[in-house]
């Protein structure tokens, strides 16, 4: 039986007992990790995933953390420019030994999922919180029905103690001049009278 797994942006065809060099995993030597991204299970009854085979996994034991071969990057500008630059790089890798290929039941195995260094383990998605609508105060009207009154202006009116259309309709010019929190327009008073009557 063989499996095709995906890790570190690459795909590998593996069998039990294979030694594999993969991109660095967040695991120490001796730990057992599980690759859950299995693209295909081969054997007597091959199974191809779309894109992954559900419930399938490949378990492996981490042998050691290693570095790959050194890659030299050399840049030289020619002729009258005596400029040279050499940069070396060694990729960090993890050497693993494939121990078992699970065609099903990978979720209940209890083995730590193989994640790259610096990646967070996939957490269960939390259900999105529904935004609770703010309950309207008892006996108050929706002041945003007045033309030119938005949510911010409605809050200012409520802060000034005006919560109903009847209160706004009963305002005199002296009352309007005495309110400093918001400038009340005469059209609001007329509209409030109409809305208060229903």
Curated annotation (Swiss-Prot):
- Keyword Ribosomal protein part of the UniProt annotation: yes
Question: Keyword annotations for this protein?
Answer: Ribonucleoprotein, Ribosomal protein, RNA-binding, rRNA-binding
GO MF term set: nucleotide binding; rRNA binding; structural constituent of ribosome
What Gene Ontology cellular-component terms does the record carry? cytoplasm; ribonucleoprotein complex; ribosome
GO BP term, example: translation
Query: Gene3D superfamilies, alphabetically?
Result: 5' to 3' exonuclease, C-terminal subdomain
Q: Which domain of life is it from?
A: Bacteria
* Subunit architecture: Part of the 50S ribosomal subunit. Contacts protein L20.
Q: Which family is this protein grouped under? A: Belongs to the bacterial ribosomal protein bL21 family.
Query: What does it do?
Result: This protein binds to 23S rRNA in the presence of protein L20.
Put simply, this protein is called Large ribosomal subunit protein bL21
């Amino acid at each position: 039986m063989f499996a095709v797994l995906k890790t570190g942006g690459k795909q590998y065809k593996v069998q039990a007992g294979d030694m594999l060099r993969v991109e660095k995993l967040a695991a120490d030597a001796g730990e057992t990790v599980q690759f859950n991204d299995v693209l295909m299970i081969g054997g007597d009854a091959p199974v191809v995933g779309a894109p992954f085979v559900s419930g399938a996994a490949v378990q492996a034991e981490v042998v050691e953390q290693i570095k790959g071969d050194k890659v030299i990057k050399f840049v030289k500008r020619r002729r009258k420019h005596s400029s040279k630059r050499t940069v070396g790089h060694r990729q960090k890798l993890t050497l693993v030994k494939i121990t078992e290929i699970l065609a099903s039941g990978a979720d209940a195995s209890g083995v730590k999922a193989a994640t790259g260094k610096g990646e967070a383990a996939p957490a269960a998605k939390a259900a999105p919180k529904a935004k609770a609508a703010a309950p309207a105060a008892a006996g108050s009207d929706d002041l945003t029905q007045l033309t030119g009154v938005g949510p911010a202006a409605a809050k200012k009116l409520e802060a000034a103690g005006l919560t109903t259309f009847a209160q706004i309709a009963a305002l005199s010019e002296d009352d309007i001049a005495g309110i400093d929190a918001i400038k009340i327009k005469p059209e609001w008073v007329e509209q409030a009278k109409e809305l208060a009557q229903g």
